[in-house]
Amino acid sequence: MVKFNFLDFDGVSLYSNCLVYQNKENIQVHLCPVIHIGDTQYYSSLLNYIQNRICIFEKINLTPSDTTLQSSAKTLEEYLEIVSPGIEEFWNQYQKLLKKFYKKFFTKDVRSLCKAVKKQSKYFDEDIKTIHDDCIKSGFGIQNMYPIQLYLCESMNLNHQLNAIDYVNDIPHRTNWIHTDLDFANLSENVDLNELVEEMLTDPSQEILEMLLKQIKMLLTNIIGMVEFKKTPEVSKRRELLASGLIHFLTQQFEELTNLAPNYILEERNSMVEDQILNLIEDHEDIVVFYGVAHMGAIERFVINQGFSFKTQHRFKAFEIDDANA
């Protein structure tokens, strides 16, 4: 079995590993993965490690209103109270197109997942029901992962990366932090949003369709995961579920990567990181890539192909399974 080296779970704690690569010119690239759910101290430790190093960081920028919402709504309840009416208002005009899209393009495995979710719906609480409904109404947009992650955080007494790190009043003012990610606010400036949505729902390219289906499967799987957490009363067992689930999923994804299977959800964002690495190593000798752990296998392969070799690693505890404060 292929080993995914960016995560470790010893049965007691879940760790993320920062792998440091160096080339013949002594330029170092620190591949510093981040788990979006963890202890507050975990995120403090990561920031302390980065310090003044040049840092490539991820954060999908949605519309300005969405960004403000994410920074102001610190709990799941606050988030859903604000965002759900907005989803209803914007996506109501596309409900007929969405139904046709689901009927025409859903594959056998997606339909199977939909049936599995429906079977679990009797266990839904109000939050899961709202998140599930919002997914359906909004075409299973990637922004729906955020409330799912908030639900898991609150069910395990853990923090979310976007709450633990101030991406509004702190990070944008750090001159050594370089935002390298999708920016839908800029992309939508010169695009007719209605035309774009209609095109994606009626005549998507094969690449876009595969991306959307992967996204839908990911969200449906996570909805089932929320139900499993709800049915598991002990916080320690929930944390164990998350830790073992992450290890299994990312190891499986890494095996697919080594077999050159494409992953369209991550590919575009990874290519942005790769271009930024090539740009920065021209003028800097110490660079951190601070990105979600799911991206790191592909980025590591790219760095190795650029002539870098492994030098050392640093370990960060994301959370303990049994926590006295949980």
Placement of each model-derived feature along the sequence:
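Structured, acidic catalytic/metal-binding patches in enzyme active sites
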Residues: 1-264, 312-323
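Extended hydrophobic/aromatic segments used for targeting, binding, or gating
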Residues: 285, 300, 305-306, 310-326
